[in-house]
Structure formats: C-alpha cells, structure tokens
C-alpha cells in the first residue's frame, strides 16, 4: 500500500469577533504575540463598536488553538463570547499584524 511521505496540513481561515472586556486590556498585543508563537498569519483590530475582530490563517488545529487561547486565556481581558466564521484561506497574509 502506498502512503505519501507527508500529508500537507489542512489550512484554514477564521474570522473571529470577540465580545466582552476586550479593548484597553492589551488584547491585540497579546493576540499578536500568541499568533506569532503559533506561526499564524492574519490581523487583529479594534472595532468602533467596542469589539475586537481577528482573522487567523494557518493550519486548522493551530488556528483552533489560537482561538481557544484568545477566548479563555487572555491575561487581562474577559471574553464573554467569540463568534467564529470559517472562510476559505486566501494566503494573502505574510505575517500577523495589529491593525489600527
């Protein structure tokens, strides 16, 4: 039986809106640090309505881990809810950035 030497990772893209106490608590900086540690590309930004929006692109399991960390382990934030929308990955990002 033939098995490929390596199976490419399943790439994913998630757009996440974080709700709760998420602005003014270093959420974006911590999000960027975690995404960089995990090798995820995309961005995070504050929205005018007081929410934080992020787009994560990378290996699906790693993206899921990053969403979980940002939802439940952000040091100073309180995330009441995270709304996740899965999208087709585009490969448009070269790094993870904080947008202003």
Q: Which ranges hold each PLM region?
A:
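Intrinsically disordered, low-complexity, mixed-charge
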Residues: 1-100
């Amino acid at each position: 039986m033939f098995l490929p030497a390596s199976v490419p990772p399943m790439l994913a893209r998630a757009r996440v809106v974080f709700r709760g106490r998420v602005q003014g608590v270093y959420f974006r900086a911590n999000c960027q640090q975690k995404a960089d540690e995990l090798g995820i590309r995309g961005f995070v930004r504050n929205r005018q309505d007081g929410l934080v929006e992020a787009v994560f692109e990378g290996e699906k399991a790693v993206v899921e881990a990053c969403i979980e960390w940002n939802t439940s382990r952000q040091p100073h934030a309180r995330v009441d809810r995270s709304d996740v929308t899965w999208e087709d990955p585009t490969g448009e990002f070269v790094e993870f950035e904080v947008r202003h």
